[in-house]
Amino acid sequence: MNPAIEFKNVTKAFVKKDGDVQTILDNVSFSIPAGKTTVIAGGSGQGKSVTLKLILGLMRVDSGRIMVQGNDVTGVRGKGLESLRTQFGVLFQGSALFDSLTVFENVALPLRERTKKNEAEIRAQVLSSLSQFELDGHEEKYPAQLSGGMQKRVGLARAMQLKPAIMLFDEPTTGLDPVMSLEIYHLFARTQAEFGFTSVIVSHDIPKIFNLADRVTILNGGKMDVFSSPEEIQWSEEPHIQEFVKTTMGDIYQSDLVEK
């Protein structure tokens, strides 16, 4: 089986205001297994969100190739890019809900824009999704009337309408308290288990999310380290990994872990 996503010798750099070049990804190669959950971690400015934007075609690589489900999508544009994006569901830091639309209208949006379903079919599917994500009775509310956790649920429900093969989450629990964050991670785990999609999560909240992950990648200084267990990371002798554990993870064994 092909990996869901594969980077082959990908380099991406930016020119800063002072003229210096900052290399975010430096000849990086890695793969994301299909049907599994991969967490991308790293400090601020290390390229986590850039990696997601490259996957979605929102940025171009400077060199190298990106494969999605076995297809080379490097530099794809036009209808090819539109087709690529139908394979993804996305939930960014903010839920990206339209404030002027109700919960129902927000969730129905991809069905109205990208399918030929009639209104009766759309209504049936949306109401079923709202029930699945414990949003019954909220369909006529507006985003501003919902808590941060409820907004995340709406965003996830909308992202799932086209049944994507791959879900991308960019800091999905930003702004939520620890209890709500844990609840949202449990929701991700249940949804992934039910639908079987590939899940890519950019997060700094490693202690709570670790048991959700089949694989963890750590970005640092343009390079990427791949780990598959808490023990593997904690016992790494690489100085930058030790620093990551100290400043970001703490003692993950004493944290409230999400069970897969």
Placement of each model-derived feature along the sequence:
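H-loop/switch region of ABC-family ATPase nucleotide-binding domains
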Residues: 203-204
